[in-house]
From Swiss-Prot:
Taxonomy of the source species: Eukaryota, Metazoa, Chordata, Craniata, Vertebrata
Binding locations of ATP: 46-54, 168-173, 348-351, 392-396, 428
Protein name: 6-phosphofructo-2-kinase/fructose-2,6-bisphosphatase 4
PROSITE patterns for the chain: PG_MUTASE
Site entry (Transition state stabilizer), positions: 391
Gene name in the database record: PFKFB4
InterPro entries per record: 6Pfruct_kin (IPR003094), 6Phosfructo_kin (IPR013079), His_Pase_superF_clade-1 (IPR013078), His_PPase_superfam (IPR029033), P-loop_NTPase (IPR027417), PG/BPGM_mutase_AS (IPR001345)
Length: 469
């Protein structure tokens, strides 16, 4: 039996790992968050205008945000790339042999790219977005998954509410490249005929015939669900997420606390109170929220003094969330960037090299913070109008989820003090309005410096530090 290897601590993530010949061994899992022992293929099912692409995009965004490398493969886009000009619904008629041939080629091309992503490029989850309305087509895709060692999970969206279908056609399909420069009524008529092309051959997932498959059926945008044979942790998280999202129009308001006493001094973390300008912002925020006349607004804060002081000025009930507390800077709490450079120059450089994954000694990383904030995202997806009064790093993580920003971009998103971001979910994304409330505040945003080498001179390490007292 081999003797246990010596351990060393990874300087970036502060994770203990074996080492040999004076160098750390490769970590057991190098592909982001390992939640499954094999890749997962998510297969969308449903007629056109049932929200499949909406679900695909949201699911892809969520999984990437929690650290699971995920990519969406929209077969409609493959078809548009192959057939540059869309003429009419006749392309989708079941007896259109040329159309059938092209659509099959597009599906196969998408599956080849799925295989490349999951088997060669280190992907964990692929979302195959197409109608997949026949049992024969789904069997072909399932066999493809089995042959390549993937777990297959079907997501079917069923909608019989005419109002929801009509709204989906107007919001999404008429903005499709297929209908650019087409009359609205003409486009609607054509799209309705396109749906008819699929209806006669549509075979929904069946509790008896498909009892061996893993799937979730979503009825009328979340009115009810059927879940069958959830196979692993990643599938259970997918189900949990899909059971929390809704399409009710709403807005989410994100802002930081008012300027704090430590903000003025350029010190990070701590639990300070508001500065005079911070208290002024809290009053302005109260007026802004009152002027917006938001129906059934919920207000959330962290459990830190500065967010609670900000919320108190609103004069409305609010809920404190410990998970909304600012990132824990560990041994660097309440230090200025200059003091961190003086006392921990190696740590300061390592953080600049990979700000998302870097973990403060005895503290947290942005990666840790994202995992901590997942319950907040789930609850935000369930709620309607919410104001979240939080902190710079926390706001960056929440904003990255809604705007689909990569991990490398997340720690550098600009979230200035005394500014409210109004996020309004739209068809395939999120509309953002930035509202500055006309109360001056210090700048706390530090860009990544050009020189991130551990041997850099102090002046190059500190070149992007914002001015402070």
């Amino acid at each position: 039996m081999a003797s246990p290897r010596e351990l060393t601590q990874n300087p970036l993530k502060k994770i203990w790992m074996p080492y040999s010949n004076g160098r750390p061994a490769l970590h057991a899992c190098q592909r982001g968050v390992c939640m499954t022992n094999c890749p997962t293929l998510i297969v969308m099912v449903g007629l056109p205008a049932r929200g499949k692409t909406y679900i695909s995009k949201k699911l892809t965004r969520y999984l990437n945000w929690i650290g699971v490398p995920t990519r969406e493969f929209n077969v409609g886009q493959y078809r548009r790339n192959m057939v540059k000009t869309y003429k009419s619904f006749e392309f989708f008629l079941p007896d259109n042999e040329e159309g059938l041939k092209i659509r099959k080629q597009c599906a196969l091309a998408a599956l080849r790219d799925v295989r490349r992503f999951l088997s060669e490029e280190g992907g964990h989850v692929a979302v195959f977005d197409a109608t997949n309305t026949t049992r024969e087509r789904r069997a072909t895709i399932f066999n493809f998954g089995e042959q390549n060692g993937y777990k297959t999970f079907f997501v079917e969206s069923i909608c019989v509410d005419p109002e929801v279908i009509a709204a989906n056609i107007v919001q999404v399909k008429l903005g499709s490249p297929d209908y650019v420069n087409r009359d609205s009524d003409e486009a609607t008529e054509d799209f309705m005929r396109r749906i008819e092309c699929y209806e006669n051959s549509y075979e929904s997932l069946d509790e008896d015939l498909d009892r061996d498959l893993s799937y979730i059926k979503i009825m009328d945008v979340g009115q009810s669900y059927v879940v069958n044979r959830v196979a692993d942790h990643i599938q259970s998280r997918i189900v949990y997420y899909l059971m929390n999202i809704h399409v009710t129009p709403r807005s989410i308001y994100l802002c930081r606390h008012g300027e704090s006493e430590l903000n003025l001094k350029g010190r990070i973390g701590g639990d300070p109170g508001l500065s005079p300008r911070g208290r002024e912002f809290a009053k302005s925020l109260a007026q802004f929220i009152s002027d917006q006349n938001i129906k059934d607004l919920k207000v959330w804060t962290s459990q830190m003094k500065r967010t609670i002081q900000t919320a108190e000025a609103l004069g409305v009930p609010y809920e404190q969330w410990k998970v909304l507390n600012e990132i824990d800077a560990g041994v660097c709490e309440e230090m200025t960037y200059e003091e961190i450079q003086d006392n921990y120059p190696l740590e300061f450089a390592l953080r600049d090299q990979d700000k998302y994954r870097y973990r403060y000694p005895k503290g947290e990383s942005y990666e840790d913070l994202v995992q901590r904030l997942e319950p907040v995202i789930m609850e935000l997806e369930r709620q309607e109008n919410v104001l979240v009064i939080c902190h710079q790093a926390v706001m960056r993580c929440l904003l990255a989820y809604f705007l689909d920003k990569a991990a490398e971009q997340l720690p550098y998103l600009k979230c200035p003090l005394h500014t409210v971001l109004k996020l309004t979910p739209v068809a395939y994304g999120c509309k953002v309005e930035s509202i500055f409330l006309n109360v001056a505040a210090v700048n706390t945003h530090r860009d990544r410096p050009q020189n991130v080498d551990i041997s850099r001179p102090p002046e190059e390490a500190l070149v992007t530090v914002p001015a402070h007292q």
